[in-house]
């Protein structure tokens, strides 16, 4: 069986909303570069038919994410990360337009503090998690959740980030 080519990121746009830019930049040094590295690491796990042409990571705040969560998921509260896959939309020269990820600063900061981790570590985990959702991974079934967690844990180790699921496994 012939292996499919690995995915390659053409363009990863990182958009930091002006209302939260100071907080994001203060919490995560070299923000754009770190977010791009985490996204590329997650993209490197896929083997789709097409090269990625473009994806966006939008670093926002709770108000915007709450609105998006309400509009698209019917949940009137902020969440840490939302992923909006584009499906199989092809751009110029057959490049796949992967989709968008939106991450809420306030929720990320609260969760990081509650879990005893840095905002940077939690952000990079959510970038990886969000990209895996864009690639079609899900965690609705336990087998797929375990696979997704394994991929995340392996990728995060490359950034010097401890297994984010270790406490959940100990409680189970």
Predicted regions and their residues:
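An acidic/histidine-cluster motif and surrounding catalytic segment
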Residues: 1-123, 134-172
């Amino acid at each position: 069986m012939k292996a499919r080519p690995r995915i390659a990121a053409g363009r990863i746009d990182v958009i930091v909303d002006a209302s939260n830019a100071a907080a994001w930049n203060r919490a995560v040094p070299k923000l754009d570069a770190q977010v791009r590295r985490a996204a590329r690491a997650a993209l490197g796990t896929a083997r789709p038919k097409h090269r990625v042409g473009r994806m966006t990571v939008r670093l926002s705040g709770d108000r915007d994410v709450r609105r998006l969560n309400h509009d698209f998921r019917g949940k009137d509260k902020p969440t840490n990360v939302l992923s909006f896959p584009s499906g199989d939309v092809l751009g110029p020269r057959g490049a796949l337009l992967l989709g968008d990820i939106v991450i809420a600063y306030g929720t990320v900061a609260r969760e990081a503090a509650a879990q005893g981790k840095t905002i940077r570590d939690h952000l990079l985990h959510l970038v990886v998690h969000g990209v895996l959702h864009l690639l079609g991974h899900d965690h609705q079934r336990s087998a797929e959740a375990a696979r997704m967690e394994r991929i995340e844990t392996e990728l995060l180790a490359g950034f010097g980030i401890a297994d984010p699921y270790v406490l959940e496994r100990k409680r189970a």
